[in-house]
């Protein structure tokens, strides 16, 4: 990834289509913060609020918007409303400008999202963590199983980070959202690549041994999976932990159990039946019905 001493990506500048390097345009960040204050202040006039809103929308189309979005979103000292807007700058670039980016530019944007994902904190508001995870999904729909082949490994690495389970919750959001948007047929971006994306989803969720037994003559094609177990097995192992006696009263683990069951429900319609059986998904969903937490029971039913 190309960059300058300020950490600002310079990819594609020579072609006039990149994130230009002007030292980060230091005057823009305080103007963004001022505009956000005007929008959210109850004391702002309607005219001031409308002008500030128009300015914030206009910034999204600027070539440097993704860089400023990454800079602000990375700064945990910023107010959540500022960081949420910063993520929206990245979201706009991914959704509406992705096809115009060169390979190095797209890689830079993806690396920024990966860095934000790794650096989420338990104290970050849930809506910020989910917004970041949605950015991951948006990039996956556009490039996973094409020029982005190590996504599964990156998810596993996040899953295995020690300490808080915040990264596990992040991965669960990515898995559920990706499953929903690839297989429900309503997302137009995913629909354009549904063949590659659906095959990749089956690949990473299913234990490798089940794939080999179910399709002994299958052509592996593009390698997208990391390790042999697959996500159905990992989800089951964590669900057992969440419902175990040592974790049953932990609010974080209760919430995690709900998210795991939500992923189960999303993947059951398309997962290979033998994989569902091998990973004991149905048995674990039945076990959740006996949980002491009503929210877990409801999702598991």
Enumerate the predicted regions with their spans:
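Karyopherin-beta/Importin-beta family HEAT-repeat alpha-solenoid scaffold
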Residues: 1-301
């Amino acid at each position: 990834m190309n960059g300058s001493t300020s950490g600002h990506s310079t990819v594609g500048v020579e072609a006039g289509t990149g994130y230009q390097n002007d030292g980060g345009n230091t005057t823009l960040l305080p103007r963004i913060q001022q505009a956000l204050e005007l929008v959210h202040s109850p004391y702002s006039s309607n005219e001031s609020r409308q002008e500030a809103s128009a300015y914030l929308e206009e910034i999204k189309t600027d070539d440097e918007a993704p860089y400023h979005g990454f800079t602000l979103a990375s700064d945990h000292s910023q107010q959540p409303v500022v960081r949420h807007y910063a993520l929206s700058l990245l979201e706009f670039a991914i959704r509406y400008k992705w096809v115009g980016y060169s390979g190095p530019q797209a890689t830079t944007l993806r690396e920024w999202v990966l860095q934000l994902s790794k650096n989420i904190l338990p104290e970050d508001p849930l809506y910020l963590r989910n917004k970041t995870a949605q950015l991951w999904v948006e990039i996956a729909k556009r490039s996973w199983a094409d020029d982005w082949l190590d996504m599964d490994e990156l998810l596993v690495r996040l899953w295995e980070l020690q300490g808080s389970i915040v990264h596990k919750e992040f991965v669960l959001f990515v898995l559920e959202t990706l499953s929903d948007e690839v297989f429900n047929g309503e997302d137009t971006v995913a629909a354009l690549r549904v063949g590659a994306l659906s095959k990749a989803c089956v690949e990473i969720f299913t234990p490798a041994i089940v794939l080999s037994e179910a399709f002994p003559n299958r052509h592996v094609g593009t390698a997208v999976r990391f390790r042999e177990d697959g996500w159905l097995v990992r989800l089951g192992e964590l669900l057992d932990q969440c419902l175990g006696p040592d974790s049953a009263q932990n609010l974080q683990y209760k919430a995690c159990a709900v998210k795991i069951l939500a992923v189960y429900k999303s993947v059951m319609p398309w997962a290979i039946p033998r994989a569902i059986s091998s990973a004991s998904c149905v048995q674990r969903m039945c076990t959740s019905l006996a949980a002491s937490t009503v929210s877990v029971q409801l999702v598991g039913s």
